[in-house]
């Protein structure tokens, strides 16, 4: 609530401590920090700077639903005023009989949200307690929290908190079922899985044109590779040492076969030729 709206009521209503406190004796016995109307926290206790109750003018979207409870409070106050008379009707808002509702909080600036209901969830931090107020507050069913806001064990606000653990467990189970795939876990070569034959047989590796060209160039200069050279080629072509070794073995076998056929053809051609 803005200070502009609160200050507009300063000249119309008397000071807050001038009203008589019910069941708590004279207001002079209360601490000075609660008698001073300028130091009261309007947003927490529902009062303005002059001690006036502004809970009726609050919007319906606040945390305590003051608009609905204020209407029921006004109806109860009108009934009490009609029964007590015109003289007592002026102060019925601030002087309620003890039988209509449980005793309010021991602060003069605390707002009575719903006197007809027994579950008054309005907590106050560092409240001043007296022997009389302690006996009255023990019989009431109000729950006071340390943070300054009353909480109920069975409200709708507890359902999101109770539903958080299952959602977090579902997220963890989903993360466990779907492990993250890193780039080095993927296959770097194209393999014909359908042409692999039996399941126990290793799939045949299909080399790219660039890889085949580089391997052919290396085989042209040297048909046998050292361990260091094999590692260099494997890193350069993104292959493994085993693939390089097998490719060179197959290439040598092919080279020997070609040379053997070539020599045999040359021998046959030379034997049949008679100068």
UniProtKB/Swiss-Prot annotation:
One of the GO biological process terms: anterior/posterior pattern specification
Compositional bias ranges of the Low complexity kind: 126-143
Annotated GO CC locations: nucleus
Spans annotated as Disordered: 84-177
Compositional bias annotation for Polar residues: 93-102
Keyword Nucleus: yes
Motif segment (Antp-type hexapeptide): 181-186
DNA-binding region listed in the record: 200-259
Function as written in the Swiss-Prot or TrEMBL entry: Sequence-specific transcription factor which is part of a developmental regulatory system that provides cells with specific positional identities on the anterior-posterior axis.
Family of the protein in this entry: Belongs to the Antp homeobox family.
Name this polypeptide is given: Homeobox protein Hox-A5
Natural source organism: Heterodontus francisci
Gene transcribed to yield this protein: HOXA5
């Amino acid at each position: 609530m803005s200070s502009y709206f609160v200050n507009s009521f300063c000249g119309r209503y008397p000071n807050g401590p001038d009203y008589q406190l019910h069941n708590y004796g004279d207001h002079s016995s209360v601490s000075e920090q609660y008698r001073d109307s300028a130091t009261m926290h309007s947003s927490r206790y529902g009062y303005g700077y002059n001690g006036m109750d502004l809970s009726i003018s609050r919007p319906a979207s606040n945390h305590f639903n003051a608009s609905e409870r204020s209407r029921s409070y006004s109806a109860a106050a009108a009934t009490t005023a009609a029964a007590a008379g015109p003289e007592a009707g002026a102060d019925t808002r601030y002087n309620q009989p003890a039988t209509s509702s449980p005793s309010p909080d021991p602060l003069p600036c605390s707002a009575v949200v719903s006197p007809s209901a027994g579950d008054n969830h309005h907590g106050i931090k560092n409240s001043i307690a007296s022997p009389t107020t302690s006996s009255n507050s023990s019989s009431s069913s109000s729950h006071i929290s340390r943070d300054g806001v009353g909480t109920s064990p069975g409200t709708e606000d507890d359902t999101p908190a109770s539903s958080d653990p299952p959602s977090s467990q579902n997220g963890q189970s989903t993360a466990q079922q779907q492990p993250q795939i890193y780039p080095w876990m993927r296959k770097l070569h194209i393999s014909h899985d359908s042409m692999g034959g039996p399941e126990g047989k290793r799939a045949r590796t299909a080399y790219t044109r660039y890889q085949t060209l580089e391997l052919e160039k290396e085989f042209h200069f040297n048909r046998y590779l050292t361990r260091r050279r094999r590692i260099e080629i494997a890193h350069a072509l993104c292959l493994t040492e085993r693939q390089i070794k097998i490719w060179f073995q197959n290439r040598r076998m092919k080279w020997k076969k070609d040379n053997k056929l070539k020599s045999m053809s040359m021998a046959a051609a030379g034997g049949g030729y008679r100068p």
